[in-house]
Regions:
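A cross-kingdom feature that marks ATP-driven nucleic-acid transaction machinery
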Residues: 250, 257-385
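Phosphate-binding site recognition
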Residues: 1-286, 291
């Protein structure tokens, strides 16, 4: 249970153990007592069950201050459960910092005890389409793509969609109506995921203002940070949670790495909701094909493409070719006669071929005019130089 005291957590643990065991359990005073009760109950099942699954969701929430939860868990696992061949212990936790530092990075008894880490990736476009169809929602692929550009591939968000309404109506109800379910999700998300949520939000909100991303040094300077340790941890956590990506601009070494915000829900929230005191409850329905909608769509579609590099490579017939992914930008310098140019996506292949990709959002097949083709060829020549 989120943000409850140790005593409240222990009381709920006792209730659940009573429910599953069918026997009234005394309320434990410590986590050591709680795990001792769990051990006693599981011992009665060892001979009659081929497999026993212990599943604890949101494990970090149990580790309240001075609770000794992690040490009690250590004793339970190393002192007994790990020796039982038919017991599997599965834990989940959205608090990335805790899971990384306290469980995966534990220097005590839980060190190197993890059998396997499970990465729950968001749905891709195809999986999103199949999920929506399973809910009886039959939209065009353009509508599915726009839905993805707003919510990403997060099943929890996609499951909120009501098949009785159109995509714009659903977005209005979920984001802009009074009491909308996703209107405050951003604040809760960061508080539950990260211990120092303020720093993480500052980083994300800064990166949201820079389309191409920022270097580590630029972020430190903009946020007036004097120590790089916390920033490194924050970057790593944000990357592991799929909020941002780290990439190199073509031709630059790792020390010039860029950090870019790529989480689609966050990009949408920061663009249309955060800081807006008054919001039209039908904003999205009324914004269709507006200049603001078109500008957002272009950038969001670029991020959608970056979420589907494997699918792009497959379509190009190079899925099995080792590839580095870059972007590239050259700033204009009139004094030196240097033209400005930018390439959204570069696939630098092991077979000594480089694909230069332009990402364009369009409601219909994009028509490459002779003038636009010439522009692309000129950009290619600038890149070659």
């Amino acid at each position: 249970v989120y943000q409850c005291s140790k005593n409240e957590m222990l009381a709920y643990f006792s209730e659940q153990l009573t429910l599953y065991s069918g026997q009234k359990q005394a309320r434990p005073k410590t986590w050591f007592e709680a795990f001792s009760q769990l051990r006693a109950y599981l011992s009665t099942l060892l001979e009659e069950r081929e497999q026993i699954i212990i599943f604890i969701d949101e494990l970090p929430w149990l580790d309240t201050p001075k609770s000794n939860f992690i040490r009690a868990l250590d004793l339970f696992w190393n002192g007994w459960a790990s020796d039982q061949p038919n017991i599997k212990f599965i834990v989940c936790g959205s608090a990335t910092t805790w899971m990384t530092n306290k469980l995966l990075g534990d220097k005590g008894g839980l060190h190197n005890r993890i059998t396997r880490k499970i990465y729950l990736a968001p749905f891709d476009l195809n999986e999103t389409e199949l999920f929506l169809q399973s809910k009886g929602i039959v939209w065009t692929r353009h509508q599915i793509a726009e839905c993805y550009m707003i919510m990403g591939g997060t099943p929890f968000y996609l499951n909120m969609i009501d098949k009785q309404y159109s995509l714009p109506q659903n977005i209005d109800m979920l984001f802009f109506a009074e009491g909308a379910e996703l209107s405050n999700e951003y604040e809760f998300l960061f508080r539950s995921l990260f211990k120092d949520s303020i720093l993480y939000r500052r980083i994300v909100e800064l990166l949201a203002k820079k389309k191409m991303g920022m270097t580590r040094e630029d972020v430190m300077k903009a946020l007036h940070l004097t120590s790089g340790g916390k920033l490194t941890e924050a970057f790593n956590d944000l990357i592991s949670c799929d909020f941002i990506r780290k990439y190199n601009s073509f031709g630059n070494k790792s020390n010039g790495a860029m950090y870019q915000l790529t989480d689609l829900y966050t990009l949408f929230y920061l663009h249309y909701i955060k800081g807006k005191e008054e919001t039209d409850e039908h904003l999205w329905s009324n914004m269709i094909d507006s200049p603001s909608h078109r500008a957002w769509s272009g950038y969001a579609f670029e991020q959608l493409c970056l979420h589907h590099i494997s699918q792009i490579k497959k379509k190009l017939g190079i899925l099995g070719v080792q590839t580095n992914v870059y972007s590239w930008q050259q700033k204009a310098n009139k004094e030196k006669g240097i033209e400005g140019a930018q390439i959204d996506l570069i696939l630098d292949r092991r077979d000594q071929i480089i694909n230069l990709c332009e990402m364009k959002y369009s409601l219909k097949a994009y028509d490459i005019t002779p003038a636009y083709l010439q522009k692309l060829l000129e950009r290619r020549e600038i890149f070659r130089q």
